[in-house]
């Protein structure tokens, strides 16, 4: 796997960060390319922040609305805070994804403004 990422803080938490003192702030973002190893994410309690995943190439498998679905290149997934996150990538499908985690007191209003 190729993993390129940037993080706001030195300390990284699997649960992410919540900051309601600012309108919007990016906690971390990155790109991952899965070439030889499969990847499985199992976050039963979700995270404290929002997450957007963009599938640039290949596909990803996501458990959404009580069913597994396969999303191909060009699709985006949004996870709100506290929403369980179950997803996987299979190296044979050559997934290349971009992701971002963000938080803030205006996040939900911004998403609503764009009907998201």
Predicted region positions:
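Ligand-binding loop in jelly-roll beta-barrel domains
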Residues: 68, 82-106
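Protein kinase-like catalytic core scaffold
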Residues: 75-77, 98
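Amphipathic alpha-helical segments enriched in hydrophobic/aromatic residues interleaved with Lys/Arg
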Residues: 108-116
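Generic protein-terminus/edge-of-domain signal
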Residues: 1-70, 76, 108
